[in-house]
């Protein structure tokens, strides 16, 4: 049995769950999310918690068991608390600022990079070297953070670029000087 899949999903008073056919909809104070379910898992509600069970022990059902448990758990957490990812910008002259709904990044190129957040994602710049990405869909928050980071990944020699908060950049030594 999947160690992740067999754990119950705790439900708060704020989250409301609807299961229609093969679609689960979770709504809460921050918004609502829906996910299409596979026919390999069955969802039941017991003692203010959701349980995800698989229909048989086939390889496909075992693979889907833990996946759908975590997808539903992330939906419940997202509509009640939301998710936030923090990016840090390092480098001389590198900065970020909001221009209306667009994030304007100065990353050492000859032009500014403008990024428009998809619907459901909120971008903030508390200071010039920090970008906060928040939303209710964990996968979308991570995808947007990865997209922004891809504009200038941190390089190993000086550490310049955009990195996740808490990410450790493995540094390299430069070339040794010749005689």
From Swiss-Prot:
Subunit field text: Part of the 50S ribosomal subunit.
Role, per record: This protein binds to the 23S rRNA, and is important in its secondary structure. It is located near the subunit interface in the base of the L7/L12 stalk, and near the tRNA binding site of the peptidyltransferase center.
Protein's UniProt keywords contain Transport: no
Keyword rRNA-binding: yes
Disulfide-bond pairs as recorded: none
Native source species: Chlorobium chlorochromatii (strain CaD3)
Gene: rplF
GO annotations of cellular component type: cytosolic large ribosomal subunit
UniProtKB keywords: Ribonucleoprotein, Ribosomal protein, RNA-binding, rRNA-binding
Protein name: Large ribosomal subunit protein uL6
HAMAP family for the chain: Ribosomal_uL6_B
GO molecular function, one term: rRNA binding
Alphabetical list of InterPro entries matching this protein: Ribosomal_uL6-like, Ribosomal_uL6-like_a/b-dom_sf, Ribosomal_uL6_a/b-dom, Ribosomal_uL6_bac-type
GO biological process, one term: cytoplasmic translation
Recorded family membership: Belongs to the universal ribosomal protein uL6 family.
């Amino acid at each position: 049995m999947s160690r992740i899949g067999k754990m119950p999903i705790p439900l708060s008073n704020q989250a409301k769950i609807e299961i229609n056919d093969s679609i689960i909809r979770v709504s809460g104070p921050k918004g609502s999310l829906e996910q299409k379910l596979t026919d390999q898992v069955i969802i039941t509600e017991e003692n203010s918690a959701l349980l995800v069970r698989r229909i048989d022990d086939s390889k496909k059902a075992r693979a889907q068991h833990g996946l759908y448990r975590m997808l539903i758990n992330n939906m419940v957490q997202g509509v009640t608390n939301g998710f936030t990812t923090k990016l840090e910008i390092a480098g001389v002259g590198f900065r970020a600022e909001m221009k209306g709904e667009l994030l304007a990044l100065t990353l050492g190129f000859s032009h500014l990079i403008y990024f428009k957040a998809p619907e459901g994602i909120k971008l903030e710049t508390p200071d010039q070297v920090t970008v906060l990405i928040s939303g209710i869909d964990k996968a979308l928050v991570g995808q947007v953070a990865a997209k922004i980071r891809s504009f200038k990944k941190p390089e190993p020699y000086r550490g310049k670029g955009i990195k996740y908060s808490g990410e450790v950049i493995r540094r390299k030594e430069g070339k040794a000087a010749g005689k």
